Amino acid sequence: MAVLDATPLLRMYARWRLGRLARQDAVAEQQRQLLRLVGSAAVTRFGRDHGFAKVASVDDYQTAVPLRRFEDFWQAYWQPSFPRLHDVTWPGTIPYFALSSGTSSGVTKHIPVSQAMVKANERAAIDLLVHHVANRPRSRIFGGRNFMLGGSAALKPLAPGILAGDLSGLAAGRVPWWARPRFFPNGPLAELADWETKTRLLARQSLQEDIRSMSGTPSWMLLFFEELQRLAPADARPLGTWYPHLEMLVHGGVSFAPYRSRFAELLAGSHAEAREVYPASEGFVAIADRGPDEGLRLLADNGLFFEFVPTDELASARPTRHWLGTAEIDLDYAVVVTSCAGLWSYILGDTVRFIDLHPPRLFVTGRSSYGLSAFGEHLTGEQIDRAVAAAAEAIGGHVIDYTVGPVFQGRGHHLYLVEFQPSVSAQQLAAFCHTVDSRLAAANADYAEHRKGDFGMDPPRAKAVAPGSFAAWMKARGKLGAQNKVPRVVADGAAFKDLCGTLSVS
């Protein structure tokens, strides 16, 4: 079905929005956002408990409200009246709950999503398009379909008027009627929950569509592209062959470093650009407004207030709580969010590093719970991701997915379980381990000290798992689909041993 090209209207809006962003004082805007949120929630149970009526500054707020995690909110505020949260931490009744993938803990969480948050997410999606047309003056992004490779759009009723589902499903359900022809999939196909069936059907139908943009998690997009390769001619491997009018590939959710070389290969010869976003079930944080290595611009005016805690202080009783007015560049921070859905100084679980403050741009560096220190080596998620990406590039391979964990035999070592494309030889696998080892030693003094002379720990080892192994494992856990992510680190030795057994790794 032909789609009326609405890109000229988008371009007109983009000129206005970009002018506003150019004049924005992000620090002042963040303070305005906080005081607006506090004022809105003063009548709630949480607002009364924390004296919101007296909060007049960032300092007042940080004095009144401690840092909390999901479990703290769940036990003290949400669980007693779940699923009907009325004037609990946000005014009115919460109509939606986003089901978090529970990447770190493995436990599915119900994250409140208010009507205000739905609108904030819609504004963030429009900002993404604004930055695209700003970088592509000849864009015709709305001349075809925008492909959202997400979870099921079907929502589960929890109570009358209250629904739960994947964040992507909540977004798909809110697309207005006039915009639906510009999005793919929709209708029954969008509501399919079985990922394997959905992938096969989407691949076949998408080849008949004029796809202009595509969004999803990198690992699941690669699985989808494998399905396309089974349908398309053998030489039709680049994305530009499958989707000749593709302009933008939107990725987020995990570090792009291990996938960069494979996507560069897929995008070769096409007119498409890769654009990173930082969405979360708790709110949309940032969008790449420039090139791939120039950071993501923080959304300072979109219903969220951000705090930043130095990662090495997160476990302390009284950590330093920065905000945009006091944050510094080149330091690692854990992200803390206050939102228009009733989250207050909520520890998001991600870590970032600012590369600029005027305007604020950052890199997502990992998860605050995503690290490995089974032997005192204190590796961060970012260091592991970068080492794996460099090692894969060194052997000419592409990583589809991987996880790493400790093995407590002898001095102990790290074992990397990696799904490569194409398959690799024993010699390549040995070279992969050598590069991972040397990169980590260069990046982390504690790791280098433990590896010196093999005294503190043995060299890392790697096992190449069969194609589809991680997808099969996720399916067995009931977590197959674009909203879920393979955990990069399984730090618990017993849990990692069980995973190895499931993947038939000895």
Question: Model-found features: residue ranges?
Answer:
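Short "domain-exit" segments at the C-terminal end of structured domains
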Residues: 106-116
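Conserved AMP-binding loop of ANL adenylate-forming enzymes
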Residues: 131-179, 189
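Conserved helicase ATPase motor motifs in RecA-like P-loop NTPase domains
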Residues: 97-104
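A broad detector of the eukaryotic-type serine/threonine protein kinase catalytic domain
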Residues: 105-106, 369
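Active-site diphosphate/adenylate-binding microenvironment
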Residues: 28, 32-97, 110, 120, ...
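Active-site glycine/GP-rich loop and adjacent strand/helix microenvironment
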Residues: 1-53, 61-65, 76, 82-83, ...
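Short acidic-hydrophobic sequence patches enriched in Asp/Glu that either
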Residues: 117-124, 298, 380
